[in-house]
Design a protein with these regions (language model features):
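Catalytic/RNA-binding core of pseudouridine synthases
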Residues: 1-158
């Protein structure tokens, strides 16, 4: 099942969890970038590739969740998994933050994709936000807002 995400990648800082929940483990200067450079890097991820799951993930190895091992500072070897990036688009770039959308196969770790994007841009990076907008035929755009439900309830006397 295909999934679509909107993500924000902060360049120049790498956290141990690849997201804002972690601690910064590395800082690097961010090279001068423009949208052409970023678009070329994003396009390089299109198609089939392999990705190593992050230590801070729910994936199990020998019956143990990786995040559980990571919290004990135990790092184990992880097998690369095949992923497919169907579409990836730059939405915005300012203040060393890349906003992008990605349509990908199940099992794709967007945090790892963000780290890999930063590496191809000759720096480090971690996600600062991630929002899944679509899964299969379900889209957040088709969802009903809670305020709409509350108004329906009030107007119907519930």
């Amino acid at each position: 099942e295909k999934k679509v995400y909107n993500a924000e990648l902060k360049l120049g800082e790498l956290t141990n969890t690849l997201d804002p929940e972690g601690v910064i483990i590395e800082k690097q200067k961010v090279p001068k970038l423009d949208t052409n450079i970023i678009n070329n890097v994003l396009d390089s991820f299109l198609g089939e590739t392999f990705q190593i799951p992050p230590m801070f993930s729910a994936k199990k190895i020998k019956g143990q969740r990786l995040y559980s091992l990571a919290r004990q500072n135990i790092e184990v070897e992880r097998e690369p998994i095949k992923i497919i990036i169907d579409d990836i688009n730059l939405m915005d770039f300012r203040n060393n933050i890349i906003s992008f959308s990605v349509k990908c196969s199940k099992g794709t770790y967007i945090r790892v994709l963000g780290k890999d994007i930063a590496e191809k841009l000759n720096t480090v990076g971690s996600l600062i936000s991630l929002k899944r907008t679509d899964v299969g035929s379900f889209s957040i755009n088709d969802s009903i807002k809670i305020e709409s439900l509350e108004n329906e309830w009030k107007s119907s006397g519930i």
